[in-house]
Amino acid sequence: MAMTKEQHEQLIAEALELENSVPILPAPPGRAPPPPPPTLEMQRHLLFAEIFTLAKTFITKEKLVALTTKNGDTQASERTSIPLVKSVLDQLGLTYTEAGSQQSKDFRNVGGIGLDIEVKKTDGNTVTFNDTCPNKDIWYLILFTGKENTRTSIPPGVLGMNGTEFIDDSEWV
């Protein structure tokens, strides 16, 4: 079950309040200390996980197959992919700022906690990053349209990951 906008804002307010509060005292003997308050990075990770979970069910295989590039017109299919993710964010009642045309980070400051999401669509096993190098501050929803040929068939699906997944093993970045 998704949290309401009010519940989400309350969670953020409580987390920020905890970050600014006095240090937590040690637990009495025999009791475990309380867990530390969630960091902003952890809040982003948890919110992205919630978005990704809904995206995997809302963006069906039929919707993904419909995104397949036709006649080399990649921009047409990308224009269709952004509204799919927008619907997911709206269903969760999240606030965000949409990027303008040809700008990086399609959805900025999602949930008011600085979560930036880039939507990528691919018909194969390559994701093109154009002008923006992936990094730890950008989260990616990758819409894979599936691949069928005589040797291998890979079904369509939604992938979700942090930008570090793309650059950790790169000797170029």
Where are these regions (language model features)?
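Nucleic-acid endonuclease domains
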Residues: A2-G111, K121-V173
